[in-house]
Amino acid sequence: MDINQKYNLWLTFDDETKKELESVTDKKEIEDRFYKDLEFGTGGLRGIMGAGTNRMNSYTVGKASLGFAKYLKDKYDGEISVAIACDSRLNSRAFEWDSARVFASQGIKVYAYTQIVPVPMLSFATRYLHCNAGVMITASHNPKEYNGYKAYDSTGCQLCTDDAKEVLSYINAIDDYSSVYNDVKTVDEYISDGMIVGVYEELFDEFIKAVKTQSLYNEHSELKIVYTPLHGTGNVPVRKVLEDKTVYVVKEQEEPNGNFPTVVSPNPEDRKALTLGIELAKEKDADIVLGTDPDCDRVGVAVKHNGEYVLLTGNQTGALLVNFVLTMKKDSLNSKSTLVKTIVTSELGANIGRSFGLQVEE
């Protein structure tokens, strides 16, 4: 099917899609919307929101969910369940419910967060509830025009390359985008049937407890922290974890807002995104600035040095964390202790690990 055929087919889907597509007069934009399907990989789906096969919308989300559901049904016997969550981005909640409905239509029980939550809480739910898989609706630190669909396995980790390729084969076997919602009932109907179960309070409490259990340093500290969630999901859980610390929150960026009105891109590793945080840090004479992206799986760190705030790179932050963890655990290290690094991570953390006598695996 060529681009024009795809375009004309999508005009028949629903009134809103038709209206949006008819408003597009630029042939190059039409081509960009339909020249390929939105790619599914180890990071799931990610793209600009809008109508078209190369966009994030209800149909591409539904198709991905249907393919993922069919993959799970072939892989597992007995009752299958998935955990689903979303961040603060535009349309995230709608995409979460779209996914939930499709999974439920395939006989898969869905545990859906009723509040926006960070990615780690989705991974936690997948394990805590003994789910076979998880889905997070988010585009991480991308600009407001984007959204995405991250897929997780039963361990709460993103799909590995081989699994992602297999899921993709199921997705690609679905030719008709408009058919993904055939015989799919409403969210309320699936809730009544017990196929969609809303979750939040218990999982939030258990997650916070699990995070605090990992702490290696519980002594009182005079450290003053500035924190910004950058309009994302981190505000409530991060403040809860740090409730016994001195924390100043950037008020202008405190509330969830998918338009991210105070930043161009909500990437905490970009100094521009931490401008307000650094201004507050100077006002409060804080020691450190922490910022998290919308789905709260990325942290930016700025530390006070000679009266100025220096933004650390991810590699620098990681190396400091490695040094801290190994220092605190040095008495329990042995000949089998191992540090695992990715190929895109600098050697600094690995060298620190070796200095403590650890084996290093890449």
Feature locations, PLM:
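Acidic, glycine-rich loop-and-beta core segments that form the ion-binding/anion-interacting portion
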Residues: 236-238, 254, 275-285, 291-329
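An N-terminal, well-structured beta->alpha segment
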Residues: 5-99, 196-222
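Secondary-structure transition/capping motifs at alpha-helix termini
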Residues: 73-77, 102-111, 129-133, 177, ...
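N-terminal small/polar loop signature for handling phosphorylated ligands or for N-terminal nucleophile
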Residues: 83-146, 248-300
